[in-house]
């Protein structure tokens, strides 16, 4: 009840052009404890005082204007459900998607997350039909050029170069620098999963449930995919030799499936 009333009030603001529900609540994989991810697309960001006036009607806790990643209001509805409200300029968002899908820009991990967010959001309000047009425009297979760019860029980050993550992780183990081991291993996995999703022409679902998503949707996975991940996690802080061996196996098996798929990774 509170959720519907909240977004309904935002929809009446003249600067708001579209509203969409993202995350697990946009699909079928959620329960009553799942948070709401609400995306409000605006010509200009509604004033904080206007947002507060709406939010205080429907929320029992509010953090207004957090900007750790995107501008957002993080709140708890009066029914106890957390809600993240993110404010975006639809033209800036469109350019971000265009840069990836049409200009084939690859990042250090998470390349197609925003594209995934667009495609898998449920539109609640779309005053001029712009958000639906954007969804329809980009509801296309992953272009070969984008797939190849993601794989090339992130494979070089995994291995084969002096700054590659596998080399950095080995050096961190040698220093007994476990903070660095943790940091570089996380970066390694960001690039590793970016390659896996690109190789399968899947958009990247984001930081949650990546293993589950890959197992459910990817047609091509490296041999011992889950087993090697488990070995890495089990040994990261207890046995550096076994952790490095797990990384080596992950890289080798990933290279094999890339080669078998006929993808040019050079």
Q: Where are the regions that the model predicts?
A:
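Helical scaffold of the NTase/Pol beta-like nucleotidyltransferase catalytic core
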Residues: 1-20
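Catalytic metal-binding acidic patch
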Residues: 23-57, 72-88
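Short, solvent-exposed loop/turn segments at secondary-structure junctions
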Residues: 26-27, 90-92, 202-204
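Conserved nucleotidyltransferase catalytic core and NTase-mimicking acidic/glycine-rich helix/loop elements
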Residues: 130-266
């Amino acid at each position: 009840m509170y959720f519907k009333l909240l977004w309904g009030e935002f929809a009446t603001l003249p600067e708001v052009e579209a509203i969409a529900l993202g995350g697990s609540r946009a699909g079928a994989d959620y329960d009553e404890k799942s948070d709401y991810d609400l995306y409000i697309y605006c010509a200009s960001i509604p004033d904080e005082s206007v947002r507060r006036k709406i939010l205080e009607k429907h929320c029992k806790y509010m953090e207004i204007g957090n900007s750790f990643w995107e501008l957002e209001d993080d709140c708890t509805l009066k029914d106890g459900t957390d809600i993240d409200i993110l404010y975006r300029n639809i033209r800036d968002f469109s350019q971000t998607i265009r840069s990836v899908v049409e200009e084939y820009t690859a990042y250090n991990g998470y390349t197609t997350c925003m594209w995934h967010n667009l495609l898998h959001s449920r539109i609640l309000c779309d005053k001029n039909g712009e958000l639906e047009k954007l969804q329809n425009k980009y509801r296309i297979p992953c272009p070969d050029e984008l797939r190849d760019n993601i794989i090339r860029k992130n494979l070089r980050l995994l291995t084969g170069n002096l700054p590659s993550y596998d080399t950095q992780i080995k050096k961190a183990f040698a220093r007994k620098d476990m903070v660095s081991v943790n940091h570089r291993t996380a970066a390694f996995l960001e690039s590793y999963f970016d390659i896996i999703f690109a190789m399968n022409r899947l958009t990247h679902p984001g930081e949650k449930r990546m293993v589950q998503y890959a197992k459910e949707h990817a047609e091509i996975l490296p041999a011992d995919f889950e087993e090697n991940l488990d070995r890495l996690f089990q040994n990261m802080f207890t046995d550096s030799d076994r952790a490095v061996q797990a990384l080596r196996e992950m890289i080798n098996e990933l290279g094999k499936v890339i080669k078998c798929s006929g993808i040019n990774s050079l």
